Amino acid sequence: ASFAEAPAGDNKAGDKIFKNKCAQCHTVDKGAGHKQGPNLNGLFGRQSGTTAGYSYSAANKNKAVLWZZATLYDYLLNPKKYIPGTKMVFPGLKKPQDRADLIAYLKESTA
């Protein structure tokens, strides 16, 4: 199912998902450094593999994904299938509601 068919996202639920599943490797605050994964500030509308100061896999650079709700929704289902060769070890979020919630949180927190 595509993002067009996704349930409405709840950014408060997404905040919990981010803290539990993403925050050990990612930050969202402007000016915050990179961790194991890149800082996600300014994520929406950015091309994959382009955050300054972070060493991306060739796969991430070459895929040239434009990050928006629809691409994140597909990517977060199974990152290694969406970008084979990505360094991201996270297996993905199988539930559409979890992905929609996380995207709602990211849309607000990374702007």
Swiss-Prot record:
Residues with N-acetylalanine modification: A1
Modification after translation: Binds 1 heme c group covalently per subunit.
GO CC term (a single one): mitochondrial intermembrane space
N6,N6,N6-trimethyllysine, modified sites: K80, K94
Gene3D superfamilies: Cytochrome c-like domain (1.10.760.10)
Binding positions for heme c per the UniProt entry: C22, C25, H26, M88
Signal sequence region: none
Pfam families per UniProt: Cytochrom_C (PF00034)
The keyword Cell wall biogenesis/degradation appears for this protein: no
Subcellular location: Mitochondrion intermembrane space
InterPro entries, alphabetized: Cyt_c-like_dom (IPR009056), Cyt_c-like_dom_sf (IPR036909), Cyt_c_1A/1B (IPR002327)
MF annotations from Gene Ontology: electron transfer activity; heme binding; metal ion binding
Domain of life, per lineage: Eukaryota
Sorted UniProt keywords: Acetylation, Electron transport, Heme, Iron, Metal-binding, Methylation, Mitochondrion, Respiratory chain, Transport
Family: Belongs to the cytochrome c family.
Role noted for this protein: Electron carrier protein. The oxidized form of the cytochrome c heme group can accept an electron from the heme group of the cytochrome c1 subunit of cytochrome reductase. Cytochrome c then transfers this electron to the cytochrome oxidase complex, the final protein carrier in the mitochondrial electron-transport chain.
Name of the molecule in the record: Cytochrome c
Species of origin: Tropaeolum majus (Common nasturtium)
